[in-house]
């Protein structure tokens, strides 16, 4: 077989034409300091703020401080294997997390990696954890209610879809229970829920996950956890990972509820990182940009306008107070960013009023416009009645003789407090909330003994389910009160069957 010279030259020409030079240029620096989840590296002159960097052992870091001589890096993983003198290289990427339907029902860490032992998550989409919040013209005002299933909230401090409502109170006052009950109540509301646990004990997160699983709520919930044992950078990033996952759904026209439990621990983790990076401390040793830390997170909650699909993110951030002091630095910051707050008080909690919501200090600035008409009608004067009762209660402790009108107000107040009590993990549908509040406002409870009020409510709900389901259905579908004559007749009929128990 003879090879012709022309063939050889044409093959060589073809090879030369197809040749592509693949030069790979990478910026490489050297670790000059390592410790406490922080590294400093020299030689990364072109690194960008927030860029992901890779250490020689595969652990990732994030560029935070860009200084003249070196770069301050927070390490997103175990740092004990990294040594001074190790290589660290730029990736040219910023921090992203996986997003999409595949995450629903899973427990993931701040980087979007599964931690529930159920195998890898099959998702191709990712979103950067830092994103620009929707602008003024991309939003619309809050106009749809988010039903929490908690009477004291839906009646006194209603929340709308797209709102930011702070839940604030001391430790062990039932903040997490409020959030879990709200998630449980979204079962038939076409909502996706994201529960972000920041700095919680792993046993606490496990309990929350099992509660959600037991009630079937994991079918529409994503849990993002950065446990107390995790490095501070992961606690700092967890809320941003949660809201990035939520934005994917919001921009697809869906409604999302994000719970941040709690932002005090995120602020403490950020303070730790900032002090280790030698940033100047400010009030309570927090860095100067701790306000921006929370404002850029919570501003990403919005109700989008109809041209963008009308999706929404509702944020329920938690802040833990010390001895009820809501005038500390982080509480006042977050109160000023959010659209209202629900204040949980420990003395109410220990006196048996649960949920321990202080109606006087709690407020919802935009939720009122989202409240359904039926609830507005029955709950209109409730807040004022409750405030008047608290005032009279403190006055009546002096033991002075009270006139009949004052005594009647006190008795009504006791029953109001009793009606607003609720068992754990038993959210109540809005039509049944309207029913008991209607009974309260229209004096059907005035002659029911205080200790029988909750029994009256549960028996009334069962009775209406069996005898007048059409009235409940009418409230649910029209969102207005049914014909008052029918409702009054039904309530009178039930009340005739109710037997008060003996005095305790």
UniProtKB/Swiss-Prot annotation:
Pfam families named in the record: ATP-synt_ab, ATP-synt_ab_C, ATP-synt_ab_N
Enzyme Commission number: 7.1.2.2
GO molecular function: ADP binding; ATP binding; proton-transporting ATP synthase activity, rotational mechanism
Catalytic reaction annotation: ATP + H2O + 4 H(+)(in) = ADP + phosphate + 5 H(+)(out)
Superkingdom of origin: Bacteria
Stored CDD domains: ATP-synt_F1_alpha_C (cd18113), ATP-synt_F1_alpha_N (cd18116), F1-ATPase_alpha_CD (cd01132)
Matching SUPFAM superfamilies: C-terminal domain of alpha and beta subunits of F1 ATP synthase (SSF47917), N-terminal domain of alpha and beta subunits of F1 ATP synthase (SSF50615), P-loop containing nucleoside triphosphate hydrolases (SSF52540)
Keywords: ATP synthesis, ATP-binding, Cell membrane, CF(1), Hydrogen ion transport, Ion transport, Membrane, Nucleotide-binding, Translocase, Transport
Binding site for ATP: 169-176
Subunit record text: F-type ATPases have 2 components, CF(1) - the catalytic core - and CF(0) - the membrane proton channel. CF(1) has five subunits: alpha(3), beta(3), gamma(1), delta(1), epsilon(1). CF(0) has three main subunits: a(1), b(2) and c(9-12). The alpha and beta chains form an alternating ring which encloses part of the gamma chain. CF(1) is attached to CF(0) by a central stalk formed by the gamma and epsilon chains, while a peripheral stalk is formed by the delta and b chains.
Top EC group: translocase
InterPro entries: ATP_synth_asu-like_sf, ATP_synth_asu_C, ATP_synth_asu_C_sf, ATP_synth_F1_a_nt-bd_dom, ATP_synth_F1_asu, ATPase_a/bsu_AS, ATPase_F1/V1/A1_a/bsu_N, ATPase_F1/V1/A1_a/bsu_N_sf
Name of the protein described by the UniProt record: ATP synthase subunit alpha 2
Localisation: Cell membrane
One term under GO cellular component: proton-transporting ATP synthase complex
Site label Required for activity, positions: 362
Annotated family: Belongs to the ATPase alpha/beta chains family.
Function: Produces ATP from ADP in the presence of a proton gradient across the membrane. The alpha chain is a regulatory subunit.
UniProt membrane topology term: Peripheral membrane protein
Keyword check for Glycosyltransferase: no
Gene3D superfamilies: 2.40.30.20, ATP synthase alpha/beta chain, C-terminal domain (1.20.150.20), P-loop containing nucleotide triphosphate hydrolases (3.40.50.300)
């Amino acid at each position: 077989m003879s090879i012709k010279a022309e063939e050889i030259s044409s093959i060589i020409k073809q090879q030369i034409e197809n040749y592509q030079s693949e030069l790979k240029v990478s910026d490489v620096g050297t670790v000059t300091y390592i410790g406490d989840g922080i590294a400093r590296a020299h030689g990364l002159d072109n690194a960008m703020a927030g860029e992901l960097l890779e250490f020689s052992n595969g652990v990732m870091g994030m560029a935070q401080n860009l200084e003249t001589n070196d770069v301050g890096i927070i390490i997103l993983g175990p740092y004990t294997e990294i040594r001074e003198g190790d290589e660290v290289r730029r990736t040219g990427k910023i921090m992203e997390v996986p997003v999409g339907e595949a995450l629903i029902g899973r427990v993931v860490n701040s980087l979007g990696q599964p931690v529930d032992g159920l195998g890898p998550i099959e998702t191709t989409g990712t979103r950067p954890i830092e994103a620009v919040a929707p602008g003024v013209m991309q939003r619309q005002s809050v106009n749809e209610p988010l039903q929490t299933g908690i009477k004291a909230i839906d009646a006194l401090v209603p929340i709308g879809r797209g709102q930011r409502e702070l839940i604030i109170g001391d430790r062990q006052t039932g903040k997490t229970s409020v959030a879990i009950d709200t998630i449980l109540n979204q079962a038939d509301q076409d909502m996706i829920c994201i529960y972000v646990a920041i700095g919680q004990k792993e046993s606490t997160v496990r309990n929350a996950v099992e509660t959600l699983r037991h009630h079937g709520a994991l079918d529409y919930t994503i849990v993002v956890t950065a446990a107390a044992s995790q490095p501070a950078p992961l606690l700092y990033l967890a809320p941003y990972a949660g809201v990035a996952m939520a934005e994917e759904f919001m921009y697809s026209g869906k409604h999302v509820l994000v719970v941040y439990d709690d932002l005090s621990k995120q602020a403490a983790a950020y303070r730790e990182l900032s002090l280790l990076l030698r940033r100047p401390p400010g009030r309570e040793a927090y860095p100067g940009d701790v306000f921006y830390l929370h404002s850029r997170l919570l501003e990403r909650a919005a109700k989008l306008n109809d041209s963008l699909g009308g999706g929404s993110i509702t944020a329920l951030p938690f802040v833990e107070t010390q001895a009820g002091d809501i005038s500390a630095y982080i509480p006042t910051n977050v109160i000023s960013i959010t659209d209202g707050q629900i204040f949980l008080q420990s003395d109410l909690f220990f006196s048996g009023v649960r949920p321990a919501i202080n109606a006087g200090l709690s407020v919802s600035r935009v939720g009122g416009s989202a409240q359904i008409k039926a609830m507005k009608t029955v709950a209109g004067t409730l807040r004022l009645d409750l405030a008047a009762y608290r005032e009279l209660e403190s006055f009546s402790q002096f033991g002075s003789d009270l006139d009949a009108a004052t005594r009647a107000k006190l008795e009504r107040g006791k029953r109001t407090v009793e009606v607003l009590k609720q068992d754990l993990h038993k959210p109540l549908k809005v039509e049944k909330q309207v029913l008991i509040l209607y009974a309260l406002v229209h004096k059907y409870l005035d002659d029911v003994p205080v200790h029988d009020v909750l029994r009256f409510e549960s028996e009334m709900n069962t009775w209406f389910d069996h005898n007048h389901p059409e009235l409940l259905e009418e409230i649910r579908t029209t969102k207005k009160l049914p014909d008052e004559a029918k409702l009054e007749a039904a309530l009178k009929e039930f009340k005739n069957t109710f037997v008060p128990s003996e005095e305790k």
